[in-house]
Amino acid sequence: MTKVLVSGGFDPVHIGHIRLFKEAKALGDYLIVLANNDNWLMAKKGFVFMKEDERKTILEAIRWIDEVQITKHSKNPTDMSICAELAEIKPDIFANGGDRDKKDADTNSSSLNPEQKLCQQLNIKMVFNVGGEKAQSSSELVKRAKQNI
């Protein structure tokens, strides 16, 4: 059985995420979605639009997804990567969406950089541009909604 992992904030889920899930599922037999927890979102964006348990419930309802896990980032995390979860889950494939590419993985300041190094150590295949070009932005959706209130 080929396990595929994707990760992200998914706050909120949008069309680009759906394309990511559909294409990632086609890469293997079992798709695990790792949603960044509320601590990670607060550190990255400064707000949480949908709490992690709500995002998890929504993700679990999407037909291409076999399993949903939430990251274990502590409050005010210094490590924004998902290396701990990658080492625990040990997927066969780590699929990255349209806004994450090899250039990003090669950039030392990117959280994808240590993830790429760990994938090499654990013999996890990294795949980029899954789901096509970046189609939408959760942050932009939230911003537009806020402007229309």
Write out the residue ranges for each language-model feature.
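Nucleotidyltransferase catalytic core that binds NTPs
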Residues: 1-149
